[in-house]
Design a protein with these regions (language model features):
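Hydrophobic beta-strand positions that form the internal "hydrophobic ladder"
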Residues: 37-40, 90, 131-133
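A flexible loop/linker signature enriched in serine peptidases of the S9 family
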Residues: 1-6, 19-29, 43-58, 69-79, ...
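Loop/turn-rich, solvent-exposed surfaces of beta-rich toroidal or solenoidal domains
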Residues: 82-87, 92
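Residue-level detector of Asp-centered blade-edge/turn motifs that repeat once per structural unit
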Residues: 35-36, 85-86, 127-129
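Short loop/turn segments that connect beta-strands within beta-propeller blades
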Residues: 11-15, 61-65, 106-110, 149-153
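Non-catalytic accessory segments flanking enzyme active sites
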Residues: 1, 7, 112-172
């Protein structure tokens, strides 16, 4: 099976399509433009035909075409990711010792910081003030919606869809 997927651009008014990742013979996908329009962030793999290869987070500079891997030092898969509104950081989920916490990588320095720890986060987003909204579950606690401040503190549960069930049934 061929797992070589590429990123392409197509002019809105028609014209030639352009392959952006032809040199990588492994998987490239999940492209997201930066809010300032300067970059395209995407997930990539390096080993052709090896579907279990680690997913990395990479950037394409739209002006120069230069490609940069941001998560070279991160020893796990990069899952879902989102740009910060100022295009300086990318937040992403990545597995880490049995959890899936929220990380932040700086586009210039490539420094990775853990923002929300010890959580099996399945989805996340944030508002204009930088407050996070995410779902996570744990043993005995089905998926619920939580919020926290921009630095990952002041966590608060905001959905209680399974509260009655949790009180009636031991779901451990």
């Amino acid at each position: 099976a061929n797992t070589n997927c590429n990123l392409w651009t197509v002019p809105v008014k028609g014209g030639e399509v352009k392959c952006l990742t032809a040199e990588n013979e492994a998987w490239d996908g999940s492209p997201v433009y930066s809010p300032d329009g300067k970059y395209i962030a995407y997930r990539m793999q390096r080993v052709p035909g090896y579907e279990s290869d680690r997913f990395l987070l990479a950037l394409i500079n739209r002006l120069t075409g230069e490609k940069t891997v941001l998560t070279e030092s991160f020893d796990n898969w990069v899952d879902d990711f989102k740009w910060s509104s100022d295009s300086k950081n990318i937040f992403f989920l990545g597995e880490d010792t049995g959890y899936q916490p929220l990380f932040k990588v700086n586009v210039k320095s490539h420094k990775i910081n853990k923002v929300i720890s010890n959580r099996a986060i399945s989805e996340f987003d944030f508002d204009a003030k930088g407050n996070f909204y995410y779902t996570y579950s744990r043993t005995g606690k089905p998926n619920s919606l939580y919020t926290s401040s921009a630095n990952g503190t002041k966590e608060r549960q905001i959905s209680f869809l399974n509260k009655d069930l949790e009180q009636e049934v031991d779901i451990r």
